[in-house]
Each structure stands twice: as structure tokens, then as C-alpha cells.
């Protein structure tokens, strides 16, 4: 049987670079598979995905061949490629080109010359399948991140593709929107028979959906097989262990023979064994510190007659505290960060830093002492190479020492090997690290971070978490907006949930997540009855004996 898509001994190096992004890749994909590409940042996942669609082939030197339904990729007709091979990217903003949802859906169909009655029929049928009729005539700019990504997916599906490629499609979605999006992908795969190849760092939700997992490292395929086989292989190599989702990781630590991947599977296994006993230890309360940053009764809207994004919101952040802002896409987390940074001014209320109204502080002092990283890191970039981005800022701050400091900083953030690359050619995770790397050069005492772990692989995420903890011990105050529940649960001091323009929950992670049904970790959902405050596999492993499954 001819493979749906096939790659034979593909190697690729980007233009003006020496290190190969892909090395000797051979891969065969059958119709109807649901494949998850796993691996570290810069391991070649995005580059590999782009080699399945000729319009997206990156510029550089390649050897080897790619086939689609038995035809060399470069010989696949343009119209066929446009219709049958679809791709959804990480950033929901990047693919939207029209003003309204219905225009976005019609755009691609009009481009391939379909008559209006066929366009109307396809859109009607798809909207009925996806179930978002209420969004059809809305402006795409008013949609939440989850809704925008749903529209991106719909704009690809309306072409009736046979192969669907997705590059970290849930990276900017809140946990509930991400779960809904992935559930829709599974439905598309099972009900429509569309082949799916998806790259992802957060494997907890996607591995249970996959029929096959491919793990990459340094441009090579290191493991390829069923989810259980690949996870078992990853367990044998220390550097891949952080990539294993929380529930299977816990059971592997317990030396279980049959590894569960979902909360339901894990609970069924636990029901077969003696109940876990636990001591409900009191949670230590940290000493109160001085309030260094506050927002007092602030309200904000982008236009005079537009809806309020924030309404009468009051928060206070203590010196040296690490706070996570969580909540659904569109609840105002990013807006609040820009107000705290002094980049925008509240319509009502005041933001104070060190007791001073933020807008009365000299802008140079603000820029040096307050580090802000947007959820769109490429907004920060003004130079043509990674090196220039870091060196020019280091030279501005430290003069002749700038070169040495820039080299050290690039190595610290795993970017030195990319120093000649254009920032826009870096992966999403690499862009995130570059923006963070540059921002930290000024040694800010306040860090305001919008989705700082987005696009980072689990290993780098742990290193960044440790770096933030070190900065915190040195007196840095950190406020971050995040959808990464596991990261927040493991590292932060305080969690605040935004809803309807206000903070509705504010607590330490263990109290915050243990009281939630949806906004909590997979480990807590699995074992909250036995261990109410357990949020990570480490929490459970510490509380339970190693041989629990054999008791």
C-alpha cells in the first residue's frame, strides 16, 4: 500500500547555517493516523512539519525526498497541495487575514475559484459540524485566543484536507480551550478520517489521543511507535524523563507494569489497591512582606464605547513574591500586565510601584527596573540577528563589557549556537528565550511576563523555573500570566484567577488548585480524594511508598 506521506533519508540545513536542522529522517505515514511529534525546543519538529507542504518548505540545502500519495512533493499540483494538505500554526493571530469569521472561511475557497453556491454549502456544513454558528458574523479581532484558533482550524477544514499538520496549536490557549480544541481534533480524525500530525510540548492531553508518537532530538528521530512504547523508551533515558506526562511519570516511578495515561485509567488502577493514607499537614504560611506593586480600583477599556476589560480591579503584590495570573483567554491577564508595566494607562484607578504612581516614574528608570516580556516575543526584536539583539542591549548597558556579557547570556539561555540566525526564523520557544534573555540584561527588580513558558520544552521549562526562583531569592518580584497550570503549581507563591474583569480567587497554589475542578493539574484530579493538596507527581511520590502498587 502506498504511504499517505513519506520521507526518505531527508537532511536539511538552513541557509547561512552549519548545523543540520534535520538529519537522515525516514518516515512513512499511513492514512488515518494521529501522530504526535515530541522533542525539545529546536529538535526539528517544526522544520519536519514544513517539509510535508511544499508552499512552506524552508530555504536552505536539503537532500532526500518527500512524497505525498506516491508523488514527489515538488510535483504535487499547487491546487491539490492547497486543498489536501492543511497547516495550523502556534500563534492564532498569524493566519487570520480577513475581518469577519465568515469572510475568513470563504477566503481560501474563493482563491481556488469555487462557485459561490459551493462555498456557501461547504461553510454551512462545516459550521454545523463544529457548532459555532454564533461566531459566524463576528469580527475576528473580538474573538478570544481559543476562538481564533478554532477559526484557523475551520479555515483549513473548509478546504476538505486529507492531511492536517499542526504546530503546537494549543500553546496560547487556556487549559479548557486547549482541551476542547484537542477533543475536536480527535473527532476530526475518527469521524472524518483525516490524518493528523501534531507537534506539542505539553503531552499530558495529547498522548492519550495519539495512535503513534515520534520523539525527536537534534534533528533526528530517536523513538517512533505506540504511545506506551515510546514513553517506556523515554523513561530509560534521563534527559527525556521530563517530557513524560505527569500521570505516566508517577506510575513509572512506582515501577508499575501497565502505565495509565488518563485520570480515569489511573483511578481505575488505584482502586485495585489498598487505600493511600495521608497526614493532612498544615500548609506553611509565609511572612508578609511590604507591598511593592499595587493596582487600586482600576478599570480599563480600549475604546470609549467598548466593553470594560478590567472593572474596579484591586491587587497587591509583595516584594520578592512570584504571582501567577490565570484564567480563560480574553479575561484581561495581558492587559493587566501592560498596566502594571506602565505601558498603558487605566481609565480609572491607579497603579503604584514602590509607592509611586507608575506614570510619574521616569520612563528610563521604568525601562531599566521593570522587565516586561510580551506573549508575542517577536514584538521585542529590532535587529537582524540573535547576536545583535543581545549584544546591542548589553553594550548600551555595560559599554566595553557588553560583548563578554552578551556571550555569557546567550550561552545561559541555550541561544549561542543560533547567534547568526534572524530572530524571526527562530522557533517559538527560542524567541521566548531570546526576549527573556535580553530583558534580564538590565537586572530588573520587577519582572512582568506574559506566557513565559510558551513554546519551551519540559527540560528548558524546569531550568527557567529554577532561574526565576534564583532571581526571586535575590529580591526580584515576578508577576506572570500563564496557561501552564503544572508550571504554576510547581513554582509560584500565589495564584490569582481573573474572571469578568476582576480577581475572583487569590491563594497559595495548594489551596488554589485543590479547590478547583477544571483549573487544576491532572495529578490533583487523579488523587485529590486521597491527597487533596498533591499537585505534581513529586508531591504524590513523596507521600506514598515506592511499592504502593504491590501492597
Curated annotation (Swiss-Prot):
Residues reported in the UniProt entry to bind ATP 2: 327-334
Mode of membrane association: Peripheral membrane protein
Residues of the ABC transporter domain: 5-243, 293-525
Binding site for ATP 1: 39-46
EC numbers for this chain: 7.-.-.-
Pfam families, sorted: ABC_tran
CDD domains per the UniProt record, alphabetical: ABC_cobalt_CbiO_domain1, ABC_cobalt_CbiO_domain2
Principal location: membrane
GO cellular component: ATP-binding cassette (ABC) transporter complex
Record's keyword terms, sorted: ATP-binding, Cell membrane, Membrane, Nucleotide-binding, Repeat, Translocase, Transport
Family of this protein: Belongs to the ABC transporter superfamily.
Function: Probably part of an ABC transporter complex. Responsible for energy coupling to the transport system.
Protein name: Putative ABC transporter ATP-binding protein BT9727_3105
Organism of derivation: Bacillus thuringiensis subsp. konkukian (strain 97-27)
